[in-house]
Design a protein with these regions (language model features):
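Glycine-rich phosphate/pyrophosphate-binding loop and the adjoining helix
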Residues: 27, 146-205
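Conserved short hydrophobic patches within well-ordered secondary structure
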Residues: 22-26, 138, 164
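Helix-loop-strand module that forms the ligand-binding subsite of alpha/beta enzymes
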Residues: 69-153, 157-158
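Active-site donor-binding loop signature of nucleotide-sugar glycosyltransferases
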Residues: 42, 139, 177-179
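N-terminal beta1-alpha1-beta2 submodule of the flavodoxin-like/Rossmannoid cofactor-binding fold
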Residues: 1-105, 112, 196-205
Length: 205
């Protein structure tokens, strides 16, 4: 089985961040069963993700500059990494009620017409492997699936489910480590419960 791990914490090399801590645990557990794991740490300067601009819309319409050629090649690399993976694990903190910007940049490079989806009359059809599973591990200070103030702001989960559905992937497992900043909560207990849930999920693959 080929695994793609996507780490999406802006503080990308801080192992004390809960998102990074869970990603490290997840990889340790996955390596007990699988050795074909590709990791993209989106905020690491060594992990280049092309940014959406006017040139990205015109790759096929003109002679490309060296930078545009490099961006197109990188986009093709990212597409191939995704297409060849059997499972995708995403580790991300919630930021301003939505996904972080580098993850959106990644999505802009893989959600491409006639590559991962096609347009038909009044609908879109995903072209990726429908048996592929995405696991979205999201950390947050608030409680977004239960708190009355936040349930209608749970955009990140809706976005991840929706965008992967567009490309044909409906198997999306959500693992939340939430309420981490609420004073009445036991943060360490929340993290430990999330670890247990993550390990159990990985063992079920």
């Amino acid at each position: 089985m080929k695994i793609l791990q996507i780490l999406a914490h802006p503080d990308y090399d801080n192992k004390n961040r809960i998102s990074n801590l869970l990603a490290e645990l997840g990889e340790e557990e996955l390596r007990k069963k699988y050795n074909n794991i590709t990791t993209l740490n989106l905020y690491d300067p060594k992990c280049y993700i092309p940014v959406m601009d006017k040139h990205m819309f015109n790759y096929d319409d003109k002679e490309l500059t060296k930078q545009e050629e490099a961006d197109k090649t990188r986009q093709e690399e990212l597409l191939n990494i995704l297409k060849k993976s059997d499972c995708v694990f995403i580790y991300m903190p919630l930021h301003n009620f939505n996904v972080v910007s580098k993850f959106k940049d990644f999505i802009d490079n893989i959600v491409i017409v006639n590559e991962t989806f096609k347009c038909e009359i009044e609908t879109m059809v995903g072209l990726d492997n429908t048996n592929k599973q995405v696991t979205f591990v999201i950390t947050s200070g608030g409680e977004f699936d239960s708190h009355i103030q936040y349930v209608n702001l749970d955009f990140a989960v809706q976005y991840v489910r929706g965008v992967f559905s567009v490309i044909g992937i409906d198997k999306v497992k959500i693992i939340r480590s939430q309420g981490l900043d609420l004073v009445h909560n036991d943060k360490q207990a929340i993290v430990e419960n999330t670890k247990e849930e993550l390990i159990k999920h990985i063992n079920s693959l």
